[in-house]
Amino acid sequence: AGPTESPAAHPNAPWIIVDIVGTGPNANKLQFIGKESLEVEHTLEVAGRLGHSHFPEYTARGDFFYVSARYRGDRSQGLPGGQLVIYDAHTLKQVKSIDVDVPAGVFSHVRSRSVTVGLQPPVPH
């Protein structure tokens, strides 16, 4: 449905999650690719019709995932700026949301302790 910026996967979760970046009509959606089928099995609208959904990330055990949802809201009229939204990784049901003015980035402390694929180790001197 469009280019992705931050795919997320976890050994204990059934899907690879991809966000859709850009300004098109799918920028508010996440897609769930089955690990066995390698096909899009689910699409989830997170941030409303005019919003963006970014940076999906699984929790350490893979039971949940969270995503930054920006709503393009007009806060002067009481509309939300954005949220960090948490979902059950198996049912895809929303568990919780936390208001955040401009949610963007990776919030997982696990990522900082994991190996980044593609980076070469430093050369010893």
Name every feature range the model reports, one short phrase each.
Residues 1-125:
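Predominantly soluble domains enriched in secretory-pathway, periplasmic, or organellar proteins
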